[in-house]
Each structure stands twice: as C-alpha cells, then as structure tokens.
Amino acid sequence: METYGLEKLGLVNAGAVYRNLTPAQLVEHALRRGEGTLSNTGALVVKTGKYTGRSANDKFIVDTPAVHDDIAWGKVNRPFEKAKFDAIRAKVLAYLQGRDVFIFDGFAGADSKYTKAFRIVNELASQNLFIHQLLRRPTAEQLRDFHEDYTIIAAPGFKCVPDIDGTRSEAAILVDYEAREVVICGTQYAGEIKKSVFSVMNYVLPKQGVFPMHCSANIGKNGDSAVFFGLSGTGKTTLSADPQRMLIGDDEHGWADDSVFNFEGGCYAKCINLSPEGEPEIYNAIRFGALVENVVMDPDTREFDFDDASLAVNSRVGYPVEYIPNAELSGMSPSVPKTVIFLTADAYGVLPPISKLNRDQAMYYFVSGFTSKVAGTEIGVTEPVPTFSTCFGEPFLPLDPSVYAAMLAEKVEKAGARVYLVNTGWNGTGKRMKLSYTRAMVTAALTGDIEKGEFVTDPTFGVQVPTSIEGVPSELLIPANTWEDKAAYEASCRKLAQSFAENFKKYTHMSAAVVAAGPKA
C-alpha cells in the first residue's frame, strides 16, 4: 500500500492512507464513517462537539534556541518544552497507527515567489475536506513533484492528559517552528488547522519582506485593490464579498512590493443569522463540497436554521473561493492597495461608523487593534467584551508587534494608501450598525466619493468624520447624535479613551507622535 512518505513522520503502520482525494470522495468517506450528514443543498454538515471555536489558551510554541529570540513570548505565545512536544507527537502518531488517515498536500500563498508547501495529515475525512477547500490546491504536476515545507497533524480523537502532557486541557495546538511541524489534538474545530497555517506564514514572510495580514482583500473594476483588517466577527468576510468588486480572499493575505496575495484558496464564513438577502454570496456557497460546522438542521427536511445558536454562535462554513461568483481566482491583485480599512466592533457605541486616519493615527489604531470580542469565536465568550488585539491579529502573530507595525507604515506610505477606521458595532441606540449602511460607507471610501464631502474632527478620538454619505442617515455618522443622554455618551468616550491609553502603555517602542495620535481621555 502506498504510504506517500508518512514513514518520515514516524507513522509506519497506518490503516488505509488516502492522499488528495476529491471533495466527492471525501464526502463519501465522511458519510460512511459517520462524521456528518448531508444538507438539502448538498453540503456536508458536522458537529464539532465541545470545541466550537478556537481554543486560544491551548496553543503553545515550542521554545528552542533557534527561535527563542524571534518570538514575542507572553500570554498569547506561550512556551512549550521540546521534550514535551516530542512526547505528545509520539503519542499522537501511536494513536494514528492502524487508523485510516487522509493527507492533503497543498500550498499557502498565491504569489509563487512566496508560496509555502503544507502537508496536512488528518484523522477525519471531514477535516481533510475542509483544508482541501481552504488551502491552495495543487495541479497534477505540482502534486507529483510535491515536497512539503511544513507538516500539520490533526488528530481530534486524541485527548491530552494535562498532568502528564503539560497541556492546559485535553486539547492542544503545538507549533514547532524549528521542526516545521504543528500538532493539533483534542479539538475538532477545523479553524485550528487554518489558523496554524496562518501562524506559520506570519513567522516566515516578514523575513522575506512581505507584510502578512489578518485581512480580507478585493479588487475594483479599475484594478484598484483594498484590504480590510479586523478580528473575527467584525465583517471582513461579509464586507469584502462585494458584487461590484472581485474578491481576492476573506481572511489571510500578504502585502508584497508589487501585489497583495491570498494565502488561501477558500473562505471560512460565519453562518449565524445568515440570509440570502443579507449575504447572498455566502448563502449560495453552502452547497456540495462545502463543510458546515455546528449549524442546526432539520433532521427530516435537512434545511438549515441559521438563526438557531443552540449548537454554537460561531457556526461556520468552509468552501473554495471558486464558489464566490466574482472571485479573483489568481488570488492576487495587479497592484498594491490604495485603500486600507480597519474594522472594529465597538461595544461602547462611541466610535464613528467611519472615519479617516492620518499616518500616525493609522499606526496607533493598527497596533491597538481595538474591537469587542464577539460571541462564539472563542470558548467562553457569549457577550460582546471590549478588547485589544495587537495588529488586529495578536493570537496569530509570533513576532513582536513592532515588526508588523513598521511593515504596515512602510507599505502604506510607499503605496500612498488612504486609511479608514470603520465601526461595524453599536451606537447610542444600543443597536448594531445596519449592514446596508456599513456597505454604503465602505463603498464611498473605495470609490473616493467620501473625499468629496466635508469632514469634522471627533473631539475625543481626533479622527476625521464625514458629515454626509449617500445612503446613510447623516445623524448616524456623528456618534453623539445617537445618544439621548449626552453625559452618558461623554462618560463612555472617556472610558474608552482611557482604555486605549492604558493599553498603549505596553508599546514602549512607539514614537511620541504615534502615542500622541491616540484618543484624548
């Protein structure tokens, strides 16, 4: 039986070994093995059990001399002993002995100058389907000559024993940059595999002069590209799926000297409250070949109830970018971005729904990475919680924030890009901003129409706020207008401004000009 080189990993006695099966074959295997069921649209539907989001506290980086000085150690990048990693790795390989395994050999990085080859070894056919659709798929010729740069082993059925293994729980995501391996066990949430690829790219690309970004990206009809930064649940996927523009990708990109390129070949979209009216591109992508996680489905009709959050608020669907009608299949833009948008979901209700930033403000708000944790994207988050995530992607950034901030500054300046802060969160009415209004504001920024009107300076945040945008009620553009209680509004402004200032104290490397660009408490 062909083993496709698994013995190099130490996996010498697997059951059947399948490599780069088609989606149809993987769906057949998943159904036969009882991993999921089919929906009335043909999508494969699975329940991931206990873990329905990323388990951020269970991720560790192996601390070796070769990488020690590179990593920004702390609450996000937790060190793990090499010997303990090797012990868990050996146990996982022993666990996989005699079991069928599914291999996907593919790529991250659409720009061939920066492409990395990944081998993903899965215990589950459904997870292999997911990563087949999310990464960049090889041609027959590429598969024949394939040599992996990195290997990820995902064995959800293997549970760690914290007292013995040195982990925090039964789940662990262990990244060994020096050995070029990742081991994922105890969690079936497929997003862990995708984000492990992202963490690797965030480590290696800055060394090649490429700025790795937790962002979505699209291209206008004139070839003008735009990038949208933001944490999970702030609207990256939704706002970049624009019928008037070509989608490059929805989550992970690199900004090189002459292009923006997608790391992936697929999308991973939230499903909660999904509707054909609100997000038709995503809704219509839920078909055969897509993997749906934790969406409630009628057992008889097999119809979805996207409004039912009883399985998870963070319900998801993974599908290839080809399922989006206006996708840019090359995964690249012909030019560097002219528009940069920072997305945030402000639970305080005081940030303007859209504002323009100068260079120092762009640095300040990028490094701050303010948003509110939105229910369900991490274990234990059920209500919006104001939070700061460095560079809008702290959980995935192994290097010091100053590395990524300096790269953004350099790229924005070189491209002459305009930077906007867009609040997709709440206002003084206690309601979240309507998607149609946010779309109108983003469109005005992308077309340049926003620059034709007047701007006023926000007294607390110092940003430039437009006074009118077509398709948006003017009273919503100025946050104070949405609050009946002006004293409460001002108190909330002060509270958020103080949070910004307190958070920014840890960035001792930033210039005085950037520090001064923050809100006035």
Which residues does each predicted region cover?
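Charged, amphipathic alpha-helical linker segments immediately N-terminal to NTP-binding catalytic cores
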Residues: 155-204
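Gly-rich Lys/Arg/Thr-decorated short loops/hinges at beta-loop-alpha junctions or inter-strand turns
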Residues: 68-73, 176-181, 385-391
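Glycine-rich, often acidic-flanked micro-motifs
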Residues: 2-42, 50-51, 206, 214-231, ...
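Hydrophobic positions on the alpha1 helix immediately C-terminal to the Walker A/P-loop
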Residues: 239
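Generic C-terminus detector
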Residues: 476, 481-521
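Conserved lysine of the Walker
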Residues: 236
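N-terminal accessory targeting/assembly segments
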Residues: 1-144
